[in-house]
């Protein structure tokens, strides 16, 4: 039996987010749903996996809360469950930019996946990858800018430095990330710096793959995922991953030692 993998987020005020945690955890465990849900006062961010029936029940359960109803989510499939347990975490920030009291409500404009290729192919558009370097090493859009960050908290420093030579020209900026949440927050930061023409890929890379299949081959390589699939290709099929030490192919079932994109097979892990 295959598994459905669902990725979703929403920026919404959840004053009682700490009370939601045990309720969601219990529901997921009872319905054999695994993955990670992050709750903060700013909203919800999650990747979960289970049967289609279980996930249908989950989203119907969320619909009971007006703040979380009608969530749009990305759906893909996996032969094995890419998660070993269910985690519901509480965070100060939904996605950590490292700036206190930052208001990300005024973010950039969406570009639909079907229009993305034409948009980033324009000579007057700067395409910025808001992911971390270890993710970008697996794949990226052609000619996109790599901020060379190790974590999302590094992005503001890079953006401030990059803006020094660009802000007066007010260029067109296109931003993207895995599922959409980081580029939504980073576009708000770029607008806060003074850029006015800021856009981002709706639904992120995963939705782009699902909607377009990378028909124009503007995506190069794989997309890193934050689960045991590690990487997926533009057809959302888990990729062929190699151990960083011995170069041996690592099967999905053996990919249990993963840290920031570094994959170790069990044999090498025993000797590290």
Swiss-Prot record:
Alphabetized SMART domains for the sequence: RHOD (SM00450)
UniProt GO BP: tRNA modification
Location of the Rhodanese domain: 121-217
EC number(s) given by UniProt: 1.14.-.-
Catalytic reactions of this protein: uridine(34) in tRNA + AH2 + O2 = 5-hydroxyuridine(34) in tRNA + A + H2O
Coiled coil: none
Active site: 177
CDD domains recorded: RHOD_YceA (cd01518)
Classification via InterPro entries: Rhodanese-like_dom, Rhodanese-like_dom_sf, TrhO, TRHO_N
Keywords for this protein: Oxidoreductase, tRNA processing
Matches recorded under SUPFAM superfamilies: Rhodanese/Cell cycle control phosphatase
One Gene Ontology MF term: oxidoreductase activity, acting on paired donors, with incorporation or reduction of molecular oxygen
Keyword tRNA processing annotated: yes
Leading EC class: oxidoreductase
Domain of life the protein comes from: Bacteria
Presence of the UniProt keyword Oxidoreductase in the record: yes
Entry's family note: Belongs to the TrhO family.
Function: Catalyzes oxygen-dependent 5-hydroxyuridine (ho5U) modification at position 34 in tRNAs.
PANTHER family cross-referenced by the UniProt entry: RHODANESE-LIKE DOMAIN-CONTAINING PROTEIN 7-RELATED, THIOSULFATE SULFURTRANSFERASE/RHODANESE-LIKE DOMAIN-CONTAINING PROTEIN 2
Listed name of the protein: tRNA uridine(34) hydroxylase
GN (gene name): trhO
């Amino acid at each position: 039996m295959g598994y459905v993998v669902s990725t979703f987020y929403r920026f919404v005020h959840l004053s009682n987010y700490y009370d939601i945690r045990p309720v969601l955890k219990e529901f997921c465990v009872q319905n054999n749903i695994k993955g990670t849900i992050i709750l903060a006062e700013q909203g919800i961010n999650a990747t979960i996996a289970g049967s289609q029936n279980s996930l249908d029940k989950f989203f119907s359960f969320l619909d009971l809360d007006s703040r979380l109803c009608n969530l749009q989510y990305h759906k893909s499939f996996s032969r094995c469950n890419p998660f070993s347990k269910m985690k519901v975490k509480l965070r100060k920030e939904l996605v950590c930019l490292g700036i206190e009291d930052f208001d990300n409500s005024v973010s950039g404009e969406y570009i639909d996946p079907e229009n993305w290729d034409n948009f980033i192919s324009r000579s007057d558009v700067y395409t910025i990858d808001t992911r971390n370097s270890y993710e970008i090493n697996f794949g990226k859009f052609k000619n996109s800018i790599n901020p060379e960050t190790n974590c999302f908290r590094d992005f503001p420093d890079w953006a401030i430095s990059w803006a020094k030579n660009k802000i007066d020209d007010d260029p067109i900026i296109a931003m993207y990330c895995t599922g959409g949440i980081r580029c939504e927050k980073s576009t708000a930061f770029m607008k806060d710096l003074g850029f006015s023409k800021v856009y981002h890929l709706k639904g992120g890379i995963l939705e782009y793959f699902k909607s377009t299949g990378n028909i124009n081959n503007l995506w190069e390589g794989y997309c890193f995922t934050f689960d045991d699939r590690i990487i997926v290709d533009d057809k959302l099929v888990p990729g062929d991953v190699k151990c960083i030490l011995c170069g041996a192919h690592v099967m999905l079932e053996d990919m249990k030692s993963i840290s920031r994109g570094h994959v170790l097979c069990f044999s090498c892990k025993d000797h590290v």
